[in-house]
A protein has these predicted regions:
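Conserved N-proximal alpha/beta basic substrate-recognition cap immediately N-terminal to
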Residues: 2, 9-111
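Structural motif
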Residues: 51-53, 129, 165
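Glycine-rich phosphate/pyrophosphate-binding beta-alpha loops
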Residues: 56, 138, 197-199, 255-265
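Rossmann-like NAD(P)H-binding beta-loop-alpha module
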Residues: 101-128
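Conserved anion/nucleotide-ligand pocket segment
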Residues: 124-152
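Phosphate-binding site of ATP-dependent enzymes
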Residues: 142-229, 242, 250
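ATP-dependent carboxylate activation and anion-phosphoryl transfer catalytic cores
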Residues: 213-284
C-alpha cells in the first residue's frame, strides 16, 4: 500500500521536502503520493500511512482539519499520531512541557476575550512578542515595544476569538536568530540557523549548523517530556530554541504538526524519516 504525503491546495511557498521524501521512499520500494488533506475524493483507507507535511492552511480551516484528523485516524495510521497532532495544535503545549521540567521561553497564555496585566508584563520583560496560540508560520506574530500597551491590546483585540501567547523578546533572537533542531524517531538529524520572522515576512534560514551540547540536551529532554506525557515518540519533530538572558537555550516552539524539515539542506536526512515511518508500521 502507498504512503500519503499530505499538503494543502495553495502553498504559500513551495515545499522542497516533498520530492526528496518521495525519492527516499522510492529507494525503499515504497510508493509515496502527494495529496491534499481536504480533497473530498481521497480514500484515506487505501494508504498504509498518512504523513502530515505541509498542511499550512489548517489555521484558516481549523474545525475541518480537526475533523480530518479524526476521520483519518479511524481508517489508517497518521504520522505523527493523532494524539500528538491534537496536542500540538495549540501552543499551550509549551506550558505542559514547562510543567514537565523543560526550559521554555517565559510564556503567558491570554485566553480569547481574556485580560492580562500588560503593565506588569512590560515591566517584567521589556519588549514583548505576541503570537496566536494556534498559528502556522509567522501569522499575526508581532513585536511590541516597552510601553506600547495600547498597541498590544489592539493587536489581540483585532484578532478576536483567538487565544494569544505573550513572551519576552529575546535579544539573542534579534541579534543572532534561533536554532532549529530536526529530529527523526526521537534522534537529532540536523539543525539550521534561522533569523527572526514577523508577520508577513519570509522565512530567513541561514543554512546548516552544528547544535551545541546544551541545545542537543534541551531537544532530548523535550522529546523525553513528550513521551512522558503519554504521547509516544514523534516520527518527526523540530525543536526551535534560542539563548535566554543567561545564555542557556530555551525552547521557543516544538513543531510536531507541519514543520519545514529543511531536507533540501541535507537530502540524505530524508532516509531517517522514512525509516521512522516504516519502523513504526513494522512495530504495529
Amino acid at each position: 500500500m502507498p504512503i500519503a504525503l499530505v499538503t494543502c491546495i495553495e502553498l504559500p511557498r513551495p515545499d522542497p521536502d516533498l520530492p526528496i521524501l518521495r525519492e527516499s521512499f522510492a529507494r525503499r520500494g515504497v510508493s509515496a503520493e502527494v495529496v491534499v488533506w481536504n480533497d473530498p475524493t481521497i480514500d484515506w483507507s487505501r494508504f498504509d500511512a498518512v504523513v502530515v507535511r505541509s498542511t499550512w492552511d489548517y489555521v484558516a480551516n481549523l474545525g475541518a482539519f480537526a475533523r480530518w484528523i479524526d476521520e483519518v485516524e479511524r481508517v489508517t495510521r497518521l504520522v505523527n499520531s493523532a494524539p500528538i497532532l491534537r496536542w500540538n495544535l495549540h501552543k499551550r503545549y509549551l506550558l505542559d512541557l514547562s510543567s514537565s521540567g523543560v526550559d521554555i521561553i517565559p510564556t503567558t497564555l491570554v485566553p480569547a476575550g481574556g485580560t492580562v496585566d500588560w503593565a506588569a508584563l512590560f515591566a517584567r520583560h521589556g519588549d514583548l512578542v505576541l503570537k496566536p496560540a494556534i498559528s502556522a508560520g509567522s501569522f499575526a506574530t508581532v513585536r511590541v515595544g516597552r510601553g506600547e500597551e495600547a498597541a498590544a491590546v489592539e493587536h489581540v483585540r483585532s484578532h478576536g476569538g483567538r487565544d494569544f501567547l505573550v513572551q519576552p523578546l529575546l535579544r539573542s533572537v534579534v541579534e543572532h536568530g534561533e536554532t532549529n533542531i530536526v529530529c527523526f524517531g526521537g534522534r537529532p538529524s540536523h539543525a539550521i540557523h534561522k533569523g527572526a520572522r514577523w508577520s508577513g515576512q519570509a522565512e530567513q534560514s541561514r543554512g546548516l549548523v552544528a547544535p551545541t551540547a546544551a541545545e542537543l540536551d534541551l531537544a532530548a529532554r523535550t522529546l523525553a517530556a513528550v513521551e512522558g506525557l503519554g504521547l509516544g515518540v514523534p516520527a518527526y519533530a523540530r525543536v526551535d530554541c534560542a539563548a535566554g538572558p543567561d545564555g542557556r537555550p530555551l525552547l521557543m516552539e516544538l513543531e510536531l504538526l507541519e514543520p519545514a524539515l529543511f531536507l533540501d539542506r541535507l537530502p540524505s536526512a530524508a532516509d531517517a524519516l522514512v525509516a521512522a515511518v516504516l519502523a513504526d508500521h513494522a512495530s504495529e
